[in-house]
């Protein structure tokens, strides 16, 4: 069987991790063993939070729409039900943006939902 020499493999593997750990504080960014643990943790957090971000933004949009809807005298659930009945195809992100940037237009949308 042929002899296998590792060459640069180990250094490349370590440098890949240390590149990912650049900017971490202290030994977490310079020492391979701690950097490896921190990078694995960071990647787990990133994976989890990419999914959490979607939930958080949806909650934010709903809170903004609800606040603006109540100013116009209707609850969030009645507003969304009315919009569905009126076949208004605005998603929550668009409604929240409308409520913040242009309250007058949002009032017109609420009037449409009220029927």
From Swiss-Prot:
Disulfide topology: none
Sample GO molecular function, one term: rRNA binding
Family annotation (Gene3D superfamilies): 6.10.160.10, Ribosomal protein L20
Keywords annotated in UniProt: Ribonucleoprotein, Ribosomal protein, RNA-binding, rRNA-binding
Entry's Gene Ontology BP terms: ribosomal large subunit assembly; translation
InterPro entries, per database record: Ribosomal_bL20, RIBOSOMAL_L20_CS, Ribosomal_protein_bL20_C
One Pfam family this sequence matches: Ribosomal_L20
GO CC annotation, single: ribosome
PROSITE patterns: RIBOSOMAL_L20
Cited CDD domains: Ribosomal_L20
Family under the similarity heading: Belongs to the bacterial ribosomal protein bL20 family.
Function: Binds directly to 23S ribosomal RNA and is necessary for the in vitro assembly process of the 50S ribosomal subunit. It is not involved in the protein synthesizing functions of that subunit.
PANTHER family per record: 39S RIBOSOMAL PROTEIN L20
Matches recorded under NCBIfam families: rplT_bact (TIGR01032)
Protein name, per record: Large ribosomal subunit protein bL20
Biological source species: Parasynechococcus marenigrum (strain WH8102)
Source species taxonomy: Bacteria, Bacillati, Cyanobacteriota, Cyanophyceae, Synechococcales
Gene this protein is translated from: rplT
């Amino acid at each position: 069987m042929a002899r296998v020499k590792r060459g640069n493999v180990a250094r490349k593997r370590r440098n890949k991790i240390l590149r990912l750990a650049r900017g971490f504080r202290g030994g977490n960014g310079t020492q391979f063993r701690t950097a490896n643990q921190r990078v694995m943790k960071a990647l787990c957090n990133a994976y989890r939070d990419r999914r959490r971000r979607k939930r958080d933004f949806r909650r934010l949009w709903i809170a903004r729409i609800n606040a603006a809807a109540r100013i116009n005298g209707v609850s969030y659930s009645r507003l969304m039900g009315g919009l569905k009945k009126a076949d208004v195809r605005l998603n929550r992100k668009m409604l929240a943006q409308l409520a913040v940037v242009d309250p007058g237009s949002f009032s017109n949308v609420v009037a449409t939902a009220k029927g």
